[in-house]
Amino acid sequence: MSGREGGKKKPLKAPKKDSKDLDEDDMAFKQKQKEQQKALEAAKANASKKGPLVGGGIKKSGKK
């Protein structure tokens, strides 16, 4: 490797792969994943509306 050839031989970005044809199983799997993601987002939204689950209990003072 001479001084003129310095640097990386590979390009920084890899060429994009061709999108493969999805069969029915893949489509069903992707649809199921989307539904699970939506359910998770809805659960997060509901959880953020309410306060903390544990609010009471023994409170410790800063003194010893």
UniProtKB/Swiss-Prot annotation:
The keyword Coiled coil applies. PANTHER family: TRANSLATION MACHINERY-ASSOCIATED PROTEIN 7. It holds the Pfam family TMA7. It comes from Drosophila melanogaster (Fruit fly). Residues 27-50 form a coiled coil. Residues 1-64 are annotated as: Disordered. This is Translation machinery-associated protein 7 homolog. It comes from the Eukaryota. Residues 27-38 have a biased composition (Basic and acidic residues). Keywords: Coiled coil. The keyword Coiled coil applies. Signal peptide: none annotated. Residues 39-50 have a biased composition (Low complexity). Residues 53-64 have a biased composition (Gly residues).
